[in-house]
From Swiss-Prot:
Gene Ontology terms for molecular function: heparin binding; transmembrane transporter activity
Keywords tagged on the record: Cell membrane, Cytoplasm, Cytoplasmic vesicle, Endosome, Membrane, Transmembrane, Transmembrane helix
InterPro entries referenced in this protein's UniProt entry, alphabetically: Ostalpha/TMEM184C
GO cellular component: cytoplasmic vesicle membrane; early endosome membrane; endosome; perinuclear region of cytoplasm; plasma membrane; secretory granule membrane; transport vesicle membrane
UniProt protein name: Transmembrane protein 184A
Protein family: Belongs to the TMEM184 family.
Transmembrane stretches, start-end: 48-68, 83-103, 120-140, 177-197, 211-231, 248-268, 290-310
Polar residues bias: start-end ranges: 379-388
Entry keyword Transmembrane: yes
Function: Acts as a heparin receptor in vascular cells. May be involved in vesicle transport in exocrine cells and Sertoli cells.
Organism: Bos taurus (Bovine)
Topology versus the membrane: Multi-pass membrane protein
Length: 414
């Protein structure tokens, strides 16, 4: 490189022409985009999450089919199938939310369905434990009058000097049922507020509905899980033959992981770890939407491991053995479909809510539910229930009617 004399005799140094500053300035000015596109919208994230989701769906779908094919103890397997459905609901819902991540916040509608089913799962697990033990009266025959074991770990440190009564079982049922009522209401309120622009994920402003819905939801789910834990600690020895530890830990892990993940992501958002603004497909989204996207991605991955754990926790072996020992043929597809329809019916939840919140509850308590064997499923009684009342009706293809027994409870025991 040589110097060329200037107009006044001073040397001028040659410099290469500068690159256009437009793209660099645009890239630097748009710091919200970062060094590259958002990972959640990349084909890698969507492909990996899709593989995990479909693997979980296949594993859980096969297990649900096995239970429906060996539907020999309906009053137990009804709740087991409901619990197993948590994987398809969580996995597919989270994957759709991830695929539709953007400025329109379509994921809120899918997440509302997922959260409502969470309440359904908590109630179903408690009801399954009740069925294992023979119903409320059978449980009271074992624990009535026994002192409550006080423990900070079990959350009973403030119950010193108290004994178990029918009121304890009623509290456990009411605490789980209230979540089944509160959660759908909060989901509906969320959808309405989002439609009017008054709800944004991660917005803790007092003028936003997110703060109040989060407070109500956390209080409701905490009460439901606390009641579930209280019931388990009170009946742990009675439930021992049914191997409840893996069942209990698996269900609580699925629910608690989603809860604490959401809380952790909200904290990271408040700390500024998640950028305030992101651009997805030309639409500007806030940090709350991005945090919800990361949670949905994590849930997609976790559901495969949850499906494996549930496969061991709620095995179909004991029910399939009943089918093999029965001389009746295997259940046809019509019986499988009717069993699935019965499983998804919320009628028992409505009846249970009316029963437990009724002022007349103090006059009676629910006895174990007895059901008739289904056609084509044999009449082998469950070892967990003393008897089965056959359906005396002529409808051979109709499901057996529920026969509920009631037992009077003295008012002073409430």
């Amino acid at each position: 490189m040589t110097d060329t004399p200037g107009l006044l005799g001073t040397p001028l140094a040659w410099t290469p022409p500068a690159r256009p500053a437009g793209p660099q300035m645009e890239r630097a000015g748009n710091g919200s985009q970062g060094p590259g596109p958002l990972f959640l919208t990349s084909p890698l994230a969507r492909g990996v999450s899709g593989v995990f989701v479909w693997a979980a769906l296949v594993l859980t779908g096969h297990q649900i089919y096995l239970h429906l094919r060996s539907y020999t103890v309906p009053h137990e397997q009804r709740y087991i199938i409901r619990l197993l459905f948590i994987v398809p609901v969580y996995a597919f819902d989270s994957w759709l939310s991830l695929l539709l991540l953007g400025g329109h916040q379509h994921y809120i509608y899918f997440d509302s369905v997922r959260d409502c089913y969470e309440a359904f799962v908590i109630y179903s697990f408690l009801s399954l434990c009740f069925q294992y033990l023979g119903g409320e009266s059978a449980i009271m025959a074992e624990i009535r009058g026994k002192p409550v074991r006080t423990s900070c770990f079990h959350g009973t440190c403030c119950l010193r000097g108290m004994t178990y009564s029918i009121g304890f079982l009623r509290f456990c049922k009411q605490a789980t049922l209230q979540f089944c009522i509160v959660k759908p209401i909060m989901a509906l309120v969320t959808i309405v507020l989002q439609a009017f622009g008054k709800y944004h994920d991660g917005d803790f402003n007092v003028r936003s509905g997110y703060l109040y819905i989060t407070l109500v939801y956390n209080a409701s789910v905490s009460l439901a899980l606390y009641a579930l834990f209280l019931f388990y600690s009170a009946t742990r020895e009675l439930l021992q033959p049914f191997e409840p530890v893996l069942k209990f830990l698996t269900i609580k892990a699925v629910i608690f992981l989603s809860f604490w993940q959401g809380l952790l992501l909200a904290i990271l958002e408040r700390c500024g770890v998640i950028p305030e603004v992101q651009v997805i497909d030309g639409s500007t989204v806030g940090a709350g939407t991005v945090a919800a996207g990361y949670q949905n991605f994590i849930i997609c991955i976790e559901m495969l491991f949850a499906s494996i754990a549930l496969r061991y926790a709620f095995t179909c072996q004991v029910y399939s053995e009943k089918t093999e020992s029965s001389p009746a043929p295997s259940a046809p597809m019509q019986s499988i479909s009717s069993g699935l329809k019965e499983t998804m019916s919320p009628q028992d939840i409505v009846q249970d809510a009316i029963h437990n919140f009724s002022p007349a509850y103090q006059k009676y308590t629910q006895q174990a539910t007895q059901e008739a064997p289904r056609p084509g499923q044999g009449s082998v009684p469950s070892p967990r229930t003393p008897t089965h009342s056959p359906d005396g009706g002529p409808g051979g293809g109709r499901k057996g009617r529920n026969v509920e027994k009631r037992m009077l409870i003295p008012a002073e025991e409430l």
